[in-house]
């Protein structure tokens, strides 16, 4: 597959503060995180999008290997935008 770069905006679970015990009222202020991830989409279906930010290309310029992939549930995805990397 030829590499195409995408920006994925998505919501992630958030919580578990590292500041110790907190009041219930303070914990109720915890919101989901807004995330931006960029990479090559290796797979996408109704359940998930598999995004890989680091890829190795073969001699033909096709994606051969990858590292640091993330599977994001589609219900969490806000938008997917292809980036034009050729000017």
What residue spans do the PLM features occupy?
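Conserved RNA-binding domains used in RNP assembly and mRNA/RNA metabolism
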Residues: 1-87
């Amino acid at each position: 597959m030829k590499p195409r770069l995408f920006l994925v905006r998505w919501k992630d679970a958030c919580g578990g503060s590292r500041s110790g015990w907190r009041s219930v009222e303070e914990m109720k202020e915890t919101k989901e995180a807004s995330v931006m991830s960029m990479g090559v989409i290796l797979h996408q279906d109704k359940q998930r999008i598999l995004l890989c930010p680091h890829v190795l290309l073969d001699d033909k310029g096709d994606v051969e290997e990858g590292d640091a992939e993330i599977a994001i549930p589609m219900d969490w995805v806000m938008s997917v935008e292809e980036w034009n990397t050729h000017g």
